[in-house]
């Protein structure tokens, strides 16, 4: 983090972005923190939109599988003034991409709808955005302060990436889960059946979707390296190599 801050301070602009490691969740729990996942998505989005020249991360973050570049591109919304969209259509797209509807925006990955006004807080932005519609046409887009709820600056367009790394096609995932349920038994089978029921009940997401990360993204090359077309600099190579070796042992176990 300090290296990232130092680079940005020297250049007087945010050209370096931090990639934290993702906290995977494999068991049912009442609440799941997506803080680091949102930070990762923010960095990945800035990378594909050329807002970030350098990606800084630790060994674990760099080696972790992530949403493939083409999947991120396909599921990222670019909303511009003058675009035509219905509130129902926009709401459905946001929910499918992991956003949570709220009465008032309080943090990342939330959105709210009040009349013809839509507020969204994408993980790649420092401030939430307010979209005002005139009928089905987008009239204005602006940033607003999360505390005062007052508009700050007007913009012509905004990039809205998914709010989760696990983007999935419902029918595809249902098919894979049914196969898993048929070929397994015990607790794991019960977990899978419960997740199938969640999907069939029209729920937009599965809290423990991380269980199926390798099903959604089977390619072992789906890491941050698929986003990089330049050079890679490794600091303290031997330490990184040993840490990576131990990390793979833990993953295998």
Say what each PLM segment does.
Residues 1-253:
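ASCE RecA-like P-loop NTPase motor cores
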